[in-house]
Amino acid sequence: MPPARDRARLPPGRLETVARAAGRRAGLVVAAYAAGESTTLCRGFTDRGGTLPVTDRTRFELGSVTKTFTSLLLADLAARGPVCLDEPLGALIPRRSLPRSPLAADITLEQLATHTSGLPRLPPGLLRTAAPSWTTNPYQAFPPEALLDSLAVSRLGHPPGTRVHYSNFGVGLLGALLTEQAGTGYDALLRAHVLEPLALTDTTADPAGPQATGHWHGRPRPPFLIPSMPAAGALRSSARDLLRYLRGLIAPHTVTPPGQPLHLALHEVTRPRRRALAGPELALAWTRRVRPAPAPALYFHSGATRGFTAFAGFSRDPAVAVVALTNTAPGLHSRFVQTAYQLLCDLAREPGGRPR
């Protein structure tokens, strides 16, 4: 099946390298933006039956790339005033629901978004409910009402704000707090503040909509369900939407008027926050890497579910972006994300972002 391309100036061979890393049977999309032009390569089918070819409108599960949308939602709400980035949990959650550490009440919303809260990677108790569906839907049996119960028995791994420790729990809790304050669900809140203003019509947290079928070791997987923490990994999206999203982060004035809350939020999420003890800096959910100096600042995030792998990354100067989506879960020796990241690095280091 021949690849679909938007424009020919960005050599499709550059995208082919990423596509090959997904494996021969995968359905995938690789899209890149550089030097003011976009190129998209689509390959394979939405399922192994070979009925529907993958297009740039095919929905793939994003996994943890969802967290970047949640951080943008947080920044937008902070710009509007209902919440503050430095708002502490003690002002939002009853003391009985907080971890026993006296420092827990001081955890801020920003620390939840930047993985510096000290909370564990997963809510205590989740692994017990996950065991029966570990290879299909490990989060589906963990109910939303269990989230605060898990928080109350959590132990902080470090004082808030002192170290980076990746936490699905933290971002999931952040989403729950934002939706509780707004009095609506995650999908509706994100749609009102981010998806509709940015015209991201293919992006949703609804698992019932049309999407590609995910695969794990060649076996089909059901749609990913994460009812207690949708803000940490529930989104599905298309390459077309994700490339538009990244271009909005590159140049906020092209998608929303200057001075508007969302315009301010698109800038806010890329502001450097903290450097891990070993590794790159963090922005608001995004990993930020400037290495080796004076390399361009790269922002990126990957994600995975039991049936999908996703990568999104961009640079503002030069203006480049890469999206890579496949309906195959990452394997032990998978290089799909690493190859997509390398493409981003290569495009950003070429003069003017123009590929050769």
Predicted features and spans:
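Short, well-ordered beta-strand elements
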Residues: T39-C42, H301, A310-A329
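Short, surface-exposed loop or secondary-structure junction motifs
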Residues: T40-F45, R100-R306
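Conserved hydrophobic/aromatic positions in well-ordered beta-strands
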Residues: A31-Y33, T287, G313, V323
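A short, polar/proline- and glycine-enriched secondary-structure boundary/capping micro-motif
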Residues: T51-L52, T309-A312, L332-Q338
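Short, conserved catalytic-motif segment at the N-terminal edge
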Residues: P3-L62, P82, A205-P207
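Short, gly/Ser/Thr-rich active-site loops of penicillin-recognizing serine hydrolases
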Residues: P272-P280, R291-P294, T328-R356
